[in-house]
Each structure stands twice: as C-alpha cells, then as structure tokens.
C-alpha cells in the first residue's frame, strides 16, 4: 500500500492541536500560507521554522509523518527550485553558460522557495493529520456561510472538498493495488524511455477510473439510503465551540506576523 502518502490522512489523538476548533486550524493554515511570503531573509525563515516545529511538537505526532508528507512533491519542489536558481539574475555570478547562470540571488531565492514549499506542506499536513474529515467539512461550511447570501452552494462545496480530501489516500492505495497486479503480469513501469513509460501508465488509468466511479456510486447509494437530501434543514450532531485556546492560537499567528514585519525592516 502507498503508506508513503500522508496528506489527507487523519491520526486520532488528544493533543493540544487535536482539541483546537477546526475553524481555528483552518483559518490558521490559510493565514500561515499568506504570511510566509512576508519572509525575505534567513532570520524570518528561522522564525517561521521554529514556530512550525513548536506547532508540530504540540500535536504529539512524530516528525517522520511530516517528512513523508514532503516526499510525493519532492521532485516538483526541486524542479521549481532549479528553475529559480538557473534563471534568476543578480548578485555575484557563480556559473554562466548561455542564458543559464547561477548567481547569488538565484541560489538564495531557490533556497527560500524550497523553505516555503516545505513549511507550507508541513502546516497543511498538520491540519489534515489532526482534523477529522467531518470536522474539516463543518469548518469549511461555517467559514463559507456568508456566501449563502449570493446563493452559493456552501454545504455541497464543503462536502465535496471533504470527500475529495478523504479519498486521496484511498485512491493512492487503489493505484498501488492495480500496479502490483500488473507487475505480477510482467508490466515494468520503470523500463524504457519517457514515451514508453507513459504508454505503460495507460493500462493503469482505465481500471483506476472504473474503480473511482464504482466507489463514487457506492458512496452516493449509501448517502441516499441514509436519507441525505442536501444541507437544507439539516442539523448537526457535533456543534463547533470556540474556546480561549483557539483565540490564543490566532493571537500567536498575529505575533508571528509582527515578528516577520520587524525582521523585514
């Protein structure tokens, strides 16, 4: 199974982060993604990294889960870093070949982008590992509630997002099963050039799509059997409650923002 995939999984627990209101965690995660772009020097990234490490320690979840969360996107991160490093001009030139050059600014910006990617993935992983899918769906629905004024389907969108998030690990597990079955029949996904590798993936996509549609149909049938008719007039078994600890967390992010502004100057 594809146990390497962490994003989308939930690990039950009773830590400080687990007990936070899902609305606070969702707001904090989006806020974090926004303020990380305020960092423009190494002192700022050290501050953000220390803040992230402290948040991870409060979750009581092993750091290896967060490191494994980076692996599926590692090649994309490295590709982005390489482009930034090779095509950014400015500062001392370390290497020059045609339009490709490695400069002081390019290396610095590349490392900054790497740090941004990793820290954002860490914080996003922290959100999904400590928040149950139903809680996340309720939080999204609550935060999007003002859009009901313009007839936006808030409940349906929040349900769709939570189901999509929940089924990411399931689809990856299904992909691994299909790949193992085809390897047993002699298919080698790592053999040949790029075109041959792409052709080898085609037989993988068809059963994966069939399996996905079957799962979607089973889910729809189960929801209809339980009387699901949308969010109109629907009551909730679990009511979200905002506590002092949630306010403290948001205040902590405000302090982080102030610290980043100070370090920028």
Q: What spans do the regions from the language model cover?
A:
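Transmembrane alpha-helix interface motif
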Residues: 1-44, 48-59, 142-145, 149-152, ...
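Alpha-helical transmembrane segments and their helix-start/interface "positive-inside/aromatic belt" motifs
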Residues: 25-26, 64-74, 246-249
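Transmembrane helix-loop junctions in multipass membrane proteins, especially transporters and channels
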Residues: 41, 45, 60-64, 88-96, ...
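Small-residue-enriched core segments of transmembrane alpha-helices in multipass membrane transport
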Residues: 51-57, 70-78
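A diffuse structural propensity rather than consistent per-protein peaks
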Residues: 62, 102-103, 243
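Juxtamembrane/interface alpha-helical elements of multi-pass membrane proteins
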Residues: 73-187
